[in-house]
Each structure stands twice: as C-alpha cells, then as structure tokens.
Amino acid sequence: MRHSKFLVVSFLALMTLSFTACSSSDDDGGKGKIERPKYLSDAARYKITTQGSTWKSLELTEDGRYFIVYDGSVSGSSSQDNDDVIVSGSYEKKGNRYVLNTVGELTITANNNSYELLLTNKGKSLKFSAQKSGTLPSNKVNDELCRTWVFSKCYIVVKYDGKKVYNASSTSANELYDGFRSAINTPEYKDKLKLSQDKEEDIDGLRLLRTVTFTHAGSYYVTTTDGREDLMNYWKWINANELIIGFSENEDQTSVHDQAALKFDNGQLIMVDSQSKGREEVTITMEFQPVHTDR
C-alpha cells in the first residue's frame, strides 16, 4: 500500500527506539495532567459485514472523533490505486444518536451478536450490519494514550565524533528538514554521515504528519496534510508497565514489525529515537499535544 509504505517509514520508523532513550510514564502529578476522554463508554470500532459495501469499518474514538475506512478495492471507491480511503472528523452524542460532522447522524442498534448501523443525511440513509471489535480495558495508561495527538515540535541532534553537526528544534517540520539537509550535506560531512542520510527521507515525511490517534480497539490512525496519505493500522502493548508498544498491519497482530517506547510528560506524548552508527549519533525527539474534541 502506498500510504502504508510512506508512513511506516516516516512516522513509525522515527518512533522505533533504543529503549534506553526514554523513561516510563510521568504525568507530573497534576500539572499538565491529561484529561479523561469525553466518550470513553461510546468508543468502539465496528467492522462492516454487509456484503458488497465500500465501507470496511467505522470507529468512534474516545475523544470525539470518527474514522470511516473505505475499501479501495471495491468499485465505487475514490481510491486511485486500491488503497483504503479514510474519512475522519469530529462527532457529538445527542441522546442515542451520534452526529458525525459532514457525514450525518448515526444510530447504532444491538442485534443479538451483531449491530445495525443507520446513517442518515439530508433525507438519505445508509444501513449496515457490523461486528464490534474487542476493546482494551479502561485504565490509567490506556486512557492516557487512547486519544488524538497532534504533532507539535521536533528536536534533532546530529553528532560526529562527539561534535554537534546539527542541533535544532522547531514546530515547523519544513524548517527542520531544510536545516538538517543543509547541515549533513556540507563538504566536510556529506561522505561521513551515512546514518543521517538514511534518515533524510523519514524527516522529510514529517512535513506531512498531522495527527496520530490511538484507540482502545487496538487501532491507530495517522492523518496528514495530504489526506491521500492517511492510514489505519494496529497497535498492542509489548510491555504496558514500561510503555512499550508494538505496531502491526494485521489485526490479529501475530507479527509486530515495529516497536516504540513512550513517555507522558506535562500533558504531552513524547517519543525519542536515538541511534548510533560508528562515530555518528542521531537523536530525534518528537512531541505531541492532545487534541481537544472540537478540533
């Protein structure tokens, strides 16, 4: 898949850590404390079972966002290359209905071991049968992670023989990429900084990164400034006590292709990638802020 290849390299690769680089959870005992999501009890992912539907799944998240995944291989999808298409936005609950911004009103009805989803918009309606995915329990660490995070800042340090070749932080991925690329391609270092050159494409990819959403259903979504690169994959805890998670393209998660260590600090989600090769060391620290429901 085009978008999976791009973002697994440019986002998840930056999250894959030397596990000594990051400590366990620390919410500073109140300052910057991460708020409890508004819709914890409503959050769920529904896998569409209606035969021939272009919809693969619909998920309502803990903090008031929805994600609809369309099957790009089914005729009628807007995908140009059979990639799944993801539509996302905010929702509100009104009585027993969910108002999905720009999409319509959703009613969910339990029917024995399955669910009926009815979506109405401007007098038109769509009806789906669905199965509900399993969910992780509500606890401190799951509830802190499972929400939408927006990329806010990145800090990059490149060292060679202990000397800093590049040392900068910015809220602008464009600014960081341009400075990083210029620093590692000087005549003095361009033939020495092999690790940095390997990471150049990853850092370039940060320019498209917008938000990351983790859910109790074990799915995660990445949205970008170019919606065609949005993706949905799966996550699970490798070690919840140490805040180490694994990522997979398969829902059963029998194989995990990447791992990441996380840290909560002053209301932020922080990910640090510190790698060395020979005399070269590259450290990338990424900061994410929680997105408010109305974003």
Pin down the residues of each PLM region.
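Bacterial N-terminal signal peptides that target proteins for export
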Residues: 1-9
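C-terminal motif of bacterial Sec signal peptides marking the signal peptidase cleavage site
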Residues: 17-21
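Outer/extracellular conduits and scaffolds centered on Gram-negative outer-membrane beta-barrels
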Residues: 10-15
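Lipid interaction determinants
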Residues: 25-86, 94-234, 238-295
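Cys/His-rich metal-coordination motifs, chiefly Zn-binding "fingers/knuckles"
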Residues: 2, 23-24
